[in-house]
């Protein structure tokens, strides 16, 4: 049976390819999302993408996720650093989450070094650009969840 994975993207990730190209690169968000879906298909995973700039909308998707998906790949954006509500929502559902960041958050501004959401996740991938989403999918494909 094909695994189903939600790619959950937080605030400002719709602007990838437009903002801070030196950090996030020049490939736009839509292309990255399409590439992640194609990669998922190639390894037997159906990927659905949801992006929102609103914390509550992300929490609502997390609440729904456990009845639909086998796992969630989450890039909470800046919410990573302070959203205990996202942390609690992740802990509140019984499916694995993998936190992914395109940039290496530990090489950036000091306030970005701490993730309050990562402790609620199976693991964190950071610093490999959009390839990080594929790395997370590979882990999900190779692991009994």
PLM feature segments, named:
Residues 91-108:
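Short, acidic/small-residue loops that bind anionic groups at enzyme active sites
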